[in-house]
Amino acid sequence: AFAPIPMLMKLGSLIGDKTEATVLDLPAERWLWDKHVDCQEPSFIFSVPHSLPREVAAVISISNRADHPDSPNVVEFRVVEPNRDIIRQEKHLNIFRQQFNAFLMQLVRSGVRIIHLYPATPISASVEIGRMLLPKTFEEIHVWEWQAPTWKPAVRLK
């Protein structure tokens, strides 16, 4: 592992979205995007109710299926087929950013101001999530880390 997921999100939050950056995953073979034209695009799924309480848990299942926390208000952003190597091309990362941003905007429109993130995400998605979380939009942002058999609080981004 390159670094714990919560620390990658913290790194992303420090870089922010104003600085241009390209984040690659750490593939087994090389530090380059996959050039194969038949590389399948990931398909992301999320559903956000029209109204939510101020504080919610957001499960993010991309590299694996993340266990849901013991919380009454849980929403999920996930990929159809979780896989550690799911983001293979820059286009895939752009699709992820676009879809995850739509997820965040729906949370805000639904009334969420305090968010607890429960991620199972690859390197690039972890850093990008940190870059995309708008500190002026959310009052508090908490990231949890899976330490079997449960989630443990790891870092507060805001």
What name fits each language-model region?
Residues G16-F46, Q89, E140-K158:
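Long, charge-dense
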Residues F2-M9, S61-A66, H116-V127:
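Gly/Ser/Thr-rich loops at beta-strand to alpha-helix junctions
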Residues P6, I95-Q99, V112, S124:
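Short, well-structured alpha-helical interface segments that form or flank functional binding sites
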Residues D38-F103:
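Redox- and metal-dependent alpha/beta enzyme cores, enriched for Fe-S-associated oxidoreductases
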Residues A1, E20-A21, R54-A58, V74-V75, ...:
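Hydrophobic beta-strand segments of well-ordered beta-sheets in folded domains
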Residues A1, Q98-R113:
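Short, basic/hydrophobic alpha-helical segments
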Residues M7-G16, S126-L134:
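Short Gly/Thr/Asp-enriched flexible loops that form oxyanion-binding sites at enzyme active sites
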Residues Q106-I114, P119-K158:
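C-terminal functional regions that serve as terminal interaction/effector modules
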